[in-house]
C-alpha cells in the first residue's frame, strides 16, 4: 500500500487554488461582516445527539462517529455546521433578538455527494435567526448572490421551491409516515408511475395535484399554473404567495421554480433554493428556511440561511474567467 495515497474523494488543495480559496473565504467573511453578521466558530466534533437530534437526523448516514476516550460517550465529526449554529443561537446567545450569524470550517462526509465531489467540503454560510418574515428570506438570497459575485461566479441561475406545498398536500391526504416518505422519494426521482400507484386511493383532486408537482417546473408562469392545478388549501396558497413575492423582489435574477424540489424535506420548513452555473450539474450554493431547527435545544426560532463549499466555488470561479 502506498503511504502517500489519500482516501477516495479526499484531497489536498494545492497552489494556486489554495490562495484562490483563501481569497474567496476572506472576501465572503468581509462581506458578511459588512452586512452585520457575527462570526461563530463551532468545534469540529460534538456529542452525537447534539449533531443528529431532530432535524439533524437527516445527516446520520453522512456522519463519522467515534467513542470519546474520556467520557465513553459517542461523538461525531460534523457533517454540517448549521445544527451547531442553531445550538449556539438557542442555548448560548440566549436572546429573543434577531441574530445574524456566519461561519466557515471543514465538514466531513462518509459518502460523497456526487461524482468526484469532495468528502471534506470547506463550508461557509450565513443565517438569520428570529425573523419569520419574507424579508429575512430575501436578505439571505441577496447575500448569497452577492457572495457568489464577490467570488467571480457568473451566469448564476436560482432554482426555488417551497416544501410547504408538498407538506400541505400530504397532510390533506392523511398519509402515514412510511407512505409519505415513499411518495417523497418517488417525486424526487420524478417517477410518475410510482406517484400514481401511491396516490391511487386518494380523491381525484389530490391525485392530480401530486401528479402535477413534477411538471410544475419553469419560469414565473409556473406560479400561475400551480394556482390553477393545485387544490385551494390555505397552506398551498400561502406558499405560492411567498414565491410570488420573492419573484417580484428578485426581478433581475434568472429564476426557475420547481414545486417538486423537496431537498432537505425533513429539515426545511418553507422556501428552499439552490444556485447553479451553466455547465455544472450540481448546486454551488443552497439554503432555505428551517424554522424548527432549534427545537431540540429548547428554542424553536424562525431561521433561514445558506451555505457554500469553498472547494466548489474555486472551480466555479475559475470557469467564469
Curated annotation (Swiss-Prot):
Pathway: Amino-acid biosynthesis; L-histidine biosynthesis; L-histidine from 5-phospho-alpha-D-ribose 1-diphosphate: step 1/9. It is found in: Cytoplasm. GO terms for molecular function: histidine-tRNA ligase activity. One of its GO terms (biological process) is L-histidine biosynthetic process. InterPro entries: aa-tRNA-synth_II/BPL/LPL, HisRS-like_core, HisRS/HisZ, HisZ. Keywords: Amino-acid biosynthesis, Cytoplasm, Histidine biosynthesis. One of its GO terms (cellular component) is cytoplasm. The keyword Signal does not apply. Pfam families: tRNA-synt_His (PF13393). Its main location: cytoplasm. The keyword Amino-acid biosynthesis applies. Heteromultimer composed of HisG and HisZ subunits. HAMAP family: HisZ. Required for the first step of histidine biosynthesis. May allow the feedback regulation of ATP phosphoribosyltransferase activity by histidine. Belongs to the class-II aminoacyl-tRNA synthetase family. HisZ subfamily. This is ATP phosphoribosyltransferase regulatory subunit. It comes from Thiobacillus denitrificans (strain ATCC 25259 / T1).
